[in-house]
């Protein structure tokens, strides 16, 4: 579960390395899960890339440490909290996605992120 002040790693090559969640988008929501959109501040970034430190960006959560339960009864859990930066059209800002992503992203219409990911769990 991601909430305000949570630090996340960035799972794409947009230039950002660490994010801090500012807000979970939605009507008065406290927690974000896989597939939810958050507003975050860039805390660490590579030089000469598309984003800079202290930029405010939108991102979609692709991995969480909290257990994710599926309707089939399966549950999965990742080793880190990670997000992918997106633009206003909900397309990824980077051209590559690193690490596995959850299948729930396809149901939330983030098909571009799913197609860029090396593994879908």
Curated annotation (Swiss-Prot):
This is Large ribosomal subunit protein uL14. Transmembrane segments: none annotated. GO terms for biological process: translation. Part of the 50S ribosomal subunit. Forms a cluster with proteins L3 and L19. In the 70S ribosome, L14 and L19 interact and together make contacts with the 16S rRNA in bridges B5 and B8. GO terms for cellular component: cytosolic large ribosomal subunit. GO terms for molecular function: large ribosomal subunit rRNA binding; structural constituent of ribosome. NCBIfam families: rplN_bact. The gene is rplN. It comes from the Bacteria. Binds to 23S rRNA. Forms part of two intersubunit bridges in the 70S ribosome. Keywords: Ribonucleoprotein, Ribosomal protein, RNA-binding, rRNA-binding. Belongs to the universal ribosomal protein uL14 family. PANTHER family: 50S/60S RIBOSOMAL PROTEIN L14/L23, LARGE RIBOSOMAL SUBUNIT PROTEIN UL14M. InterPro entries: Ribosomal_uL14 (IPR000218), Ribosomal_uL14_bac-type (IPR005745), Ribosomal_uL14_sf (IPR036853). It comes from Prochlorococcus marinus (strain MIT 9211).
């Amino acid at each position: 579960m991601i909430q305000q002040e949570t630090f996340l790693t960035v799972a794409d090559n947009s230039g950002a390395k660490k994010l801090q969640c500012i807000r979970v988008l939605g009507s008065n929501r406290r927690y974000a899960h896989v597939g939810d959109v958050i507003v975050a501040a860039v805390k660490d970034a590579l030089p000469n890339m598309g984003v800079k430190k202290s930029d405010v960006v939108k991102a979609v959560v692709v991995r969480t440490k909290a257990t994710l339960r599926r309707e089939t009864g399966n549950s999965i859990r990742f080793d880190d909290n990670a997000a992918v930066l997106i633009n206003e059209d909900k397309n990824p800002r980077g051209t590559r996605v690193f690490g596995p992503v959850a299948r729930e992203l396809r149901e939330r219409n983030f098909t571009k992120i799913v197609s860029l990911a090396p593994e879908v769990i």
